[in-house]
């Protein structure tokens, strides 16, 4: 069982001890992320976090990387709208020096001008390279369209234009804003005791300065009416990417788990409605799914597919028809019985390792989820009835008020797609390489 404990200065710690393997996983997170980037400085939070391992406390970037390798460790970074997390793993005998290294990275980053210039160039190149991924383009366009005017529309990675304007003062300001002790959440999993975790947690928390906590609780996103098509125009696309969606769920909704369960019927398994109709019957897309994302505020419901260019228009038409049927008629008793059994049984794979169990506890803390969100997941699913599942789909979702994203070649595909969308309210064509 994951144990929660308080650390100095308002930081919070977790430990999930296990002797299964001689490894220790750790995570150091803060309760703020890209939502707090200043206007015109999109990407600066992630930029500052990446700079932590590019020089600290007299160590160069090369020396830091060599130390990580020598310890047999791994260290990765994840930056989202509301959180920043450093994830590490190391063999047990090297926990002490690994924690010492991370303490130095957190507490005394150098932010050398030459490293900032190098990372600025690398980030700009990565953003350009990301345009090679049609899926990434679809996700970016969807987020910007669905959450237009809301902080959730912004990309943690930033834009080429904003990255170009990031200077050292911006990086230092972002570091000082986000890395404050009262916002720190630290977790350990694996071959480590509770006493050891508390001792190492105190060392890590002490490395971070005390300061004013960041308020990253954005307003509730606004629902936008009508079917709105955004076509991301990219040359020579023989395959397309589609995303159809709207606002979805919030973990504190009374009907959250009924909607999660119903959505799994629509597109959450290999035998879901979408897989059966789009892949198995018609062969239009190898993969297709529906999902709900969670955040501190209501986030997105999405349906995705990747049909060939010739099949894109009928595939979009079918997805909209499936959504209309799902919202209007709901799911069947047989479908509900199957999906509840599937979700309950497969949950074992969500908690079969100490790092996974730790991850659930940390996520609950960071995203302010209900305290029993993960610990009583199975009970929540079992409590879903046909009435609550269908009411949730009908209440929370709409087939009439959706964003429709297509990444393809407009000259070949746009007109056909438009003809297959009844009651289309608007169309925007966006160049794939737009900032």
Predicted features along the sequence, with ranges:
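Acidic/histidine-enriched segments that form metal/cofactor-coordinating
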Residues: 65-174, 195, 203, 220-222, ...
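M16/insulysin-pitrilysin zinc metalloprotease superfamily fold
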Residues: 54-58, 88-122, 269, 289, ...
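N- or domain-start disorder-to-order transition segments that initiate the globular core
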Residues: 1-24
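Histidine-acidic residue clusters that define the catalytic metal-binding segment
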Residues: 1-5, 126, 144-184, 216-221, ...
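C-terminal regions of mature proteins
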Residues: 2, 185-191, 302, 340-435
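Buried hydrophobic packing residues in well-ordered domains
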Residues: 10, 28, 46-48, 68, ...
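An aromatic/glycine/proline-enriched structural segment found at the starts
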Residues: 148, 152, 156, 180-181, ...
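M16/MPP (pitrilysin/insulinase) zinc-metallopeptidase core fold and M16-derived inactive scaffolds
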Residues: 25-92, 132, 155, 268-284, ...
């Amino acid at each position: 069982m994951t144990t929660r404990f308080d650390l100095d200065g308002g930081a919070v710690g977790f430990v999930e001890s296990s002797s299964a393997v001689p490894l220790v996983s750790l995570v150091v997170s803060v309760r703020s992320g890209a939502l707090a980037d200043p206007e015109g400085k999109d990407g600066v939070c992630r930029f500052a976090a990446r700079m932590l391992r590019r020089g600290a406390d007299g160590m160069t970037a090369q020396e830091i990387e060599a130390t990580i390798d020598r310890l047999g460790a791994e260290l990765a970074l994840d930056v989202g709208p509301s959180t920043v997390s450093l994830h590490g793993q190391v063999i047990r005998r090297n926990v002490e020096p690994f924690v010492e290294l991370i303490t130095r990275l957190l507490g005394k980053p150098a932010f050398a001008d030459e490293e900032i210039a190098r990372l600025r160039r690398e980030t700009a190149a990565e953003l350009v390279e990301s345009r090679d991924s049609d899926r990434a383009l679809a996700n970016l366009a969807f987020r910007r369209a669905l959450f237009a005017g809301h902080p959730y529309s912004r990309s943690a990675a930033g834009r080429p234009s904003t990255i170009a304007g990031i200077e050292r003062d911006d990086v230092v300001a972002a570091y000082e804003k986000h890395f404050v002790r009262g916002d720190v959440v630290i977790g350990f999993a694996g071959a480590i005791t509770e006493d050891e975790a508390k001792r190492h947690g105190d060392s890590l928390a002490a490395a971070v300065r005390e300061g004013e906590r960041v308020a990253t609780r954005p307003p509730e996103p606004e629902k936008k009416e009508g079917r709105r098509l955004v076509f991301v125009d990219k040359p020579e696309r023989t395959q397309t990417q589609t995303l159809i969606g709207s606002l979805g769920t919030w973990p504190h909704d009374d009907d959250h788990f009924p909607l999660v369960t119903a959505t799994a019927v629509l597109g959450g398994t290999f035998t879901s409605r979408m897989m059966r109709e789009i892949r198995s019957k018609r062969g239009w897309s190898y993969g297709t799914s529906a999902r709900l994302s969670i955040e501190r505020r209501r986030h997105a419901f999405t349906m995705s597919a990747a049909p060939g260019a010739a099949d894109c228009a009928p595939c979009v038409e079918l997805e909209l028809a499936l959504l209309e049927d799902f919202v209007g008629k709901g799911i069947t008793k047989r479908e509900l019985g199957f999906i509840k059994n599937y979700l309950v049984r497969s949950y074992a794979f969500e908690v079969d390792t100490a790092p996974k169990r730790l991850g659930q506890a940390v996520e609950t803390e960071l995203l302010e989820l209900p305290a029993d969100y993960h610990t009583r997941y199975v009970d929540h699913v079992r409590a879903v009835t046909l009435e609550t599942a269908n009411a949730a789909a009908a209440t929370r979702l709409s087939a009439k008020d959706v964003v429709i994203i297509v990444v393809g070649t407009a000259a070949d595909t746009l007109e056909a797609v438009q003809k297959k969308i009844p009651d289309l309210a608007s169309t925007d064509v966006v160049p794939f390489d737009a900032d």
